[in-house]
Amino acid sequence: MLGRCFPPDTKEKQQLRMTKLCDPAESELSPFLITLILAVLLAEYLIGIIANGFIMAIHAAEWVQNKAVSTSGRILVFLSVSRIALQSLMMLEITISSTSLSFYSEDAVYYAFKISFIFLNFCSLWFAAWLSFFYFVKIANFSYPLFLKLRWRITGLIPWLLWLSVFISFSHSMFCINIXTVYCNNSFPIHSSNSTKKTYLSEINVVGLAFFFNLGIVTPLIMFILTATLLILSLKRHTLHMGSNATGSNDPSMEAHMGAIKATSYFLILYIFNAVALFIYLSNMFDINSLWNNLCQIIMAAYPASHSILLIQDNPGLRRAWKRLQLRLHLYPKEWTL
């Protein structure tokens, strides 16, 4: 998301109403590289929307047909809806900020994008963390009484936890408005010449920033890391036990366990990269038009798409539905030619 520039020590800084823009910061990137980045981002957005739309459609159809949906399916519906909305929002924001910067920089428009962006990102982080938590409780092999009690109650807890995550994400997105503001200094002298250079400064509420990121990003990140790591360790231990019983490396159960370990490891890596990129991006560590800032955007756009594709490949029901869809798409052109 692009930032705005507020001239310091003005009424606009105090009132934050219909602020005049400073001239956009000079881009460090060539036009070709900017075009390439935009093309990559748009491709990632479209892939993410298609993949998450497929996941949502399959589980929504199951929900309507059976008047019920599995707990994992419920989480996936919440997750896919948040990601479709997020990818669509980011694609719309790039389009508006590139074609009508003055309209995008109006207070109402800018803050609508800012709040929606953070809300949907935090929802996505929380829903993915609850999905990892659910898989951990259902699959991991631990015999602790508290863990067994949690496994028995997890189905009833998940709907409440999902809506609690929505409330937490919305609260944090509303709280974020005055955490960081970018200011423009129009009269920074260049000592080697008689000219001046435009510089951009950030003012950050450190206490608010710490509270904001701890509950919004760090908490679901820690939960995801812990549950995914414990699940991998449990699966690895069970796999070693199966190997010691000489079941053979080609045993379907052994292959299923190894596949689950790989999938969980990929999920963990993707989640960490996305959370770190989001943290850096929202912290305003780099200039708006810098290569590092654009790299964070690419990572954030790639995560929903790649994670959803892995979910389709790893879930037998979704994988079968995807193959049926591919088969129908291949048959339609043949029917049209008859």
Swiss-Prot record:
What is the designated name of this protein? Taste receptor type 2 member 39
Listed under GO biological process in this entry are: detection of chemical stimulus involved in sensory perception of bitter taste
Glycan attachment residues as annotated in the record: N185, N194
Gene of origin? TAS2R39
Principal localization reads membrane
Task: List the SUPFAM superfamilies hit by this protein, alphabetically.
Answer: Family A G protein-coupled receptor-like
Cytoplasmic side residue ranges read: 52-74, 138-156, 227-262, 313-338
Extracellular compartment spans: 1-30, 96-116, 178-205, 284-291
Q: Which organism is it from?
A: Gorilla gorilla gorilla (Western lowland gorilla)
A GO cellular component entry from the record: membrane
